[in-house]
Amino acid sequence: GFKVERWRAYDETGMVFGYPSEVEVDVTVSDGKLILIEVSSHVRASDVLQFRRKAELYEKMTGRKPDRLIIVTPYIDEKALEAARQLGVEAYTKV
């Protein structure tokens, strides 16, 4: 089995958005693998980069490196798909 929980933290240095702000991401552990998940109605390349930065912040603050980064969306731009490939983010569009 697995459990999904929302992780929230305050990004004091502005690592994710470029200014200090609240950051949240969905986290699940399945078969001992740590997975970060972002669900969005429409994903652009900038969203993929932002999600990658959330993962880096998560690792920095918790000391736990995610095994997988997953974006789930009904619509993703072509440039976002390319960004996901280059940044090691899995994109699921037909779930």
How does the language model describe each region?
Residues 6-9, 38, 71, 93:
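Structural signal for conserved beta-strand scaffold positions within catalytic alpha/beta enzyme cores
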Residues 66-70:
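Short active-site oxyanion
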